[in-house]
Amino acid sequence: MALEEARVAFDEDEVPIGAVIVSLSKGVIARAHNQREGLKDPTAHAEMIAITQAAGSMQSWRLEDCVLYVTLEPCPMCAGAVVLAQMPMVVYGALNAKAGACDTLYRIPADPRLNHRAQIVGGVLADRCGAILTEFFAAKRELGER
């Protein structure tokens, strides 16, 4: 499902990242993709939109029984939101060499100095998650964009 959301982002000329949140008690409660360009909002990452949807669905900012699935390792903003939402787990696809905040550059959700920690599982369908990003940015370079 997260890859389907990434494809929607790709088709909307957004960086193709998709996110899904699953509640252990309710099932899938949120699906989102990047919308920074369309919304003209630097915080409109797939994870942030999905967390907002999930909080609405759960009627709580505490997402203690929810797992975030995302196609790219979350950035510092999104990793911080996971901590603030008290989510127990993040499952991501491709590593984020430029802004990864779960494994690559930082380990925000695992930082013992914070009031909450989340388990991180990385590399799930990494090849497929990375391929859509590679395809998107190759097309942008070919067009002389970004």
Where are these regions (language model features)?
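Glycine-rich oxoanion-binding loops at beta->alpha junctions
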Residues: 48-53, 121
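Small-residue (primarily alanine) positions within well-ordered alpha-helices
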Residues: 2, 6-9, 19, 30, ...
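Immediate flanking context of iron-sulfur cluster ligation sites
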Residues: 60-72
